[in-house]
Amino acid sequence: MRVEERLLKYVSYWTTSDEECRQIPSSERQFELGKVLEQELRDLGLEKVTLTDHCYVYGLQPATKGYADKPAVGFISHMDTAPDFSGKDVKPQIIPDYDGNDVLLKGSGAYLKVSDFPTLKTLKGRTLITTDGTTLLGADDKAGVSEIMTAVEQIITEKIPHGDIWIGFTPDEEVGSGADLFDLDYFKARFAYTVDGDYEGEVAYENFNAASASFEINGVNVHPGEAKDIMINAALVGCEIASLLPENETPAHTEGREGFYHLTDFSGDIAHAKVNYIVRDHDKATFEKRLDTLRGIEKKMNEKYHADTVKLNIQHSYSNMLEVIEKNEYVVAIAKKAIKNVGLEPVSRPVRGGTDGARLSFMGLPCPNLGTGGYGFHGPFEHISVEGMDTAVSVIKEIVKITAE
């Protein structure tokens, strides 16, 4: 099956994860795609194929005879799509020989604009796949799933010699728990790659350190006519907290390795309010200073008003995998050689986010991230080219060949 055929098939399944649910999977609908992938792996003849009770799919393509001593490599993608935008009833638009201009998204009437996504110019002449503007596409990360499945099929049909190849498809990556129940006792790769990036030829091995932070604010509500020196307006305290953070250290004002505080939700009234942030930085020391800044705000507010007015809860999300990859540089070297073998120069940029691979790296499985050829993830302007997906398939195959040398 062609890689784009797989993508169009997989995006027809609604697999949006639910950030309000703490179970894994966070949405039962992810099992529908999991069942399809389980069967496809069985149909390809893989061994140790299983779909777990928590919606993880695993499979093993055993080593070619005489190659059992070669290192076992793994490839991992996630089945869920981001809850940021609808992933239900996806209606892809397929544009052969794309002309390099703005694209009308016929369902919404919006345009995918070259001015907003300059990389569109590099896709001129290719077959472009977009949304119709009413949903996201789901290339994040069903493109990765499609590319892994297609690469495995081609490795088998082309009789490419290889060591053990482990395949893993996870739920709930988009809500930060995709690696929580990943079974490394079952998935016996020495190293692996998530296929969950964007640029063709990308191998990413540096990501944010990440945490979520929640300020719970308890106010004092009395009649406004008798409120002097008594009332504490929790909503106003929340505004004050937001004002104490640097206004130029938000996602809209930062790039590259610059970190940020991101206000994700603010709700409440006079009696009670809640202010939620995510905190990100590539540098570990700077990241810890950011968390200390939040703790300082909590202390300041409780000193200004009264004890227990503000309670801060910080939850660690993931760490920068660079700390692990620096001790396992061969994993990146293999990927870069594979990318060069398909005629591209490797692209390695700091990821302004995280992947399952970041968590897995700290669990003992070095796991950089490979590009899928997709862009504009998490919204209606998501798009990908067939040729970019073909390139990702080729990179996976080259990694397998190099690992078997």
Label each PLM-derived region with a short phrase.
Residues 10-11, 269-271, 346-399:
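Zn-dependent metallopeptidase/amidohydrolase metal-coordination segment
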Residues 2-28, 129-130, 318, 378-379:
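N-terminal capping segment at the start of a domain
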Residues 67-161, 391:
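Active-site metal-coordination/substrate-binding segment of hydrolases
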